Design a protein with these regions (language model features):
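Bacterial N-terminal signal peptides
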Residues: 17-26
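Sec/Tat signal peptide C-region and signal peptidase I cleavage site
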Residues: 27-31
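Short, low-complexity Ser/Thr-rich regulatory SLiMs
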Residues: 154, 179-181, 208-212
Length: 245
C-alpha cells in the first residue's frame, strides 16, 4: 500500500519551477487564441491587402508631383511620369522643361550647384530608408509580430484599426498602419525613424486613396527631415491603365 508523501520546501520549489516552465511554454499559444489571435488576423489582412494592391498597381501609369521646401522656402515643383518596371521598381521619366540654371556669378552658381547635389544625395539616402516602410513589407511585418513588437489600437466606431510596429526596420523606429477593417484597405501610414543617428529624425505621413476599380494607392506623402529642415511633399495623380482601358 502506497503512503502519502508530504512535500517539503524543496518539493514546493520544484513544483513552482515546473509550473513556471509550463507557463512559459504555453503562454504564446494561449495568447494566439485571445488578443494575439486577433492581432495575427489583422497583420495577415494588411499583408494580403498590400500584396493585392501592389499587383494591381503594376497595370497603371501615373503622374508624380514633388514639392520640396528647404528651411521654409518652397522650391519649384517637379513632375515625373511613373510606372512599374519588369523588376518591380518604379520607373520615372521627368516631365516638363529642365530646371533653369542658377543665376549670378560663377562662384554663386558653383555654391548653389554643390548645395543641390548635397540635397539630392541626402534625399537618395532618405528614400532608400523609407522604401523599407512604404509599401509595408510582409516579411518585416511578420517578423515584428513574431518578436512581439506589434500592438493594436482599435476604433470600433470608425471601423479603422491602428496597427503599431516597433523596431520594424531598425531599433527605435515606429510604423503605424491605419487599416479600414470594413473596406480591407490601408488608409494611412505614419513612420517615425532616423538616418544614421537617432538625432537625425525623419518622419513620413502617407495618405491612401482608391481608384474606380477599388485599387488602393498612395495619394500623398509628406516627408520631414528635421535635421536638414527639409520637407518633401509628393502627390500621385492621373492614374491611367497601361492597357488603355
Amino acid at each position: 500500500m502506497k503512503k502519502n508523501v508530504k512535500q517539503g520546501p524543496a518539493g514546493n520549489r520544484s513544483m513552482l519551477l515546473i509550473g513556471a516552465a509550463m507557463l512559459a511554454t504555453f503562454a504564446p499559444a494561449l495568447a494566439q487564441t485571445g488578443a494575439g489571435g486577433e492581432l495575427q488576423q489583422k497583420v495577415a489582412a494588411v499583408k494580403q491587402s498590400v500584396a493585392e494592391n501592389q499587383q494591381r498597381l503594376h497595370q497603371y501609369q501615373w503622374t508624380e508631383t514633388t514639392q520640396l521646401t528647404l528651411k521654409g522656402d518652397p522650391k519649384p515643383p517637379s513632375q515625373s511620369a511613373c510606372q512599374y518596371g519588369p523588376d518591380g521598381k518604379v520607373l520615372k521619366s521627368p516631365l516638363g522643361p529642365p530646371p533653369e540654371p542658377p543665376s549670378g556669378g560663377r562662384m554663386k552658381q558653383k555654391i548653389v550647384a554643390k548645395k543641390k547635389e548635397e540635397i539630392k544625395d541626402y534625399m537618395g539616402q532618405v528614400k532608400g530608408l523609407l522604401a523599407m516602410y512604404v509599401p509595408p513589407d510582409p516579411q518585416h511585418m511578420q517578423q515584428a509580430f513574431q518578436l512581439g513588437k506589434v500592438s493594436l489600437n482599435p476604433n470600433p466606431s470608425s471601423g479603422v484599426t491602428q496597427i503599431v510596429f516597433k523596431d520594424y526596420a531598425q531599433t527605435g523606429d515606429q510604423m503605424t498602419i491605419s487599416f479600414d477593417t470594413v473596406a480591407k484597405k490601408v488608409s494611412s501610414v505614419n513612420v517615425n525613424t532616423y538616418m544614421d543617428e537617432p538625432k537625425d529624425v525623419v518622419t513620413l505621413a502617407v495618405q491612401f486613396a482608391s481608384l474606380p476599380d477599388s485599387t488602393n494607392y498612395v495619394q500623398q506623402t509628406v516627408l520631414d527631415a528635421t535635421a536638414k529642415k527639409l520637407v518633401v511633399t509628393t502627390t500621385n495623380s492621373d492614374y491611367r491603365s497601361l492597357g488603355g482601358q
